[in-house]
């Protein structure tokens, strides 16, 4: 190869240009690392909430305890209608028409107009959302309209009781599928952590065919609102991957805010979880990616492990992640009883 380059000056110049071009992203990565000599701990609220239910302490007491130990950031998952339904403390119910009609005397549970919608439904995938407060009704309806293109639904509000009946949309999306659309962070959860002085990091879950421009814009606005230091992707796709405009908006937000792209380790710790488009996103944001050590279930279970009396081996995995694999964030999850692990 050396002899060929000596005989062909043009080829040598091309090779040199190629070498220099390859150094540009490398230098960018090195500079990013030099300005990134710290580690951070981000609390996973979902697992902390499960732990609180298994303990004698309240959520507030646990949140205060972690704050006293220096943990001041929390990842809050955006909720779907089904997530809200599964939370007994939130007065929201979501189900398909088929499920709603399974209970005895179901028609008596709804206003006459709403019951008529359900009776006339010809698609078992049509969905109904029922709220027990007007504020919940408005929050959910506004979220659907902000995040889904050309959202259509029949709505009914009487006093504090609201109903949203969702049928097949213009793009063919079934009502049942829309129950999985992430709507935002439930306001009471936001208030809980703001009251305790935590910095909130919104974490959404993308769904194919529901990850367009409106969804990306709404999620980015949420990141801006909370001034999130990290973008933590989760779900089927990279946020906004379904169109170029959305990816441009995400790139612009990250560059303007200085927020880093959180790259979650795989459970075998060999590589990071990736989505199509994430490499380009890193390229276009100055390689501001930070590696995240995720406490997978098998690590959470290393309590009294390797002869230790307590969680020492879990702590050791934190140290190895930071010192050996250059992880900058510990995604802190709780030690749970096996039935909720």
Identify what each model region corresponds to.
Residues 1-6:
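N-terminal Lys/Arg-rich, disordered targeting/topogenic segments
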Residues 9-26:
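Hydrophobic membrane-insertion alpha-helices, especially the h-region
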Residues 29:
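Acidic, glycine-enriched catalytic cores built around paired aspartates
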Residues 32-341:
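Soluble extramembrane regions of membrane proteins in the secretory/endomembrane system
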């Amino acid at each position: 190869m050396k002899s060929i380059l000596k005989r062909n000056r043009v080829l040598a110049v091309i090779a040199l240009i190629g070498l220099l071009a390859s150094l540009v992203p490398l230098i960018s990565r090195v500079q990013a690392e030099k300005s990134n000599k710290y580690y951070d701990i981000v609390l996973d609220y979902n697992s902390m909430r499960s732990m609180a239910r298994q303990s004698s302490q309240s959520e507030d007491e646990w949140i205060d305890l972690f704050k006293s130990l220096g943990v001041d950031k929390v990842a809050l998952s955006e909720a779907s209608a089904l997530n809200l339904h599964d939370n007994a403390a939130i007065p929201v119910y979501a189900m398909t028409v088929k499920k709603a009609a399974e209970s005895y005397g179901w028609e008596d549970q709804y206003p006459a107009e709403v019951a008529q919608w359900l009776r006339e439904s010809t698609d078992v995938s049509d969905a109904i959302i029922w709220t027990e407060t007007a504020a919940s009704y408005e929050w959910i309806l506004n979220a659907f309209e902000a995040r889904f293109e050309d959202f259509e639904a029949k709505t009914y509000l009487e006093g504090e009781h609201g109903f949203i009946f969702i049928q097949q949309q213009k793009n063919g999306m079934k009502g049942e599928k829309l129950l999985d659309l992430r709507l935002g962070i439930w306001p009471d959860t936001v208030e809980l952590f703001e009251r305790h002085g935590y910095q909130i990091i919104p974490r959404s879950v993308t769904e194919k065919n529901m990850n367009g421009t409106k969804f990306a814009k709404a999620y980015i606005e949420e990141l801006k609102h909370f001034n999130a230091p990290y973008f933590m992707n989760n779900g089927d796709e990279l946020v906004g991957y379904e169109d170029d405009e959305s990816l441009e908006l995400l790139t612009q937000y990250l560059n303007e805010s200085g927020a880093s792209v959180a790259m979650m380790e795989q459970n075998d710790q060999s590589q990071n979880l990736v989505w199509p488009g994430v490499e380009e996103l890193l390229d276009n944001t100055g390689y501001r990616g930070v590696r995240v050590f995720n406490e997978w279930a098998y690590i959470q279970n290393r309590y009294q492990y390797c002869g230790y009396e307590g969680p020492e081996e879990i702590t050791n995995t934190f140290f190895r992640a930071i010192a050996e694999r250059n992880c900058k964030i510990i995604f802190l999850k709780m030690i749970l009883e096996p039935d909720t692990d």
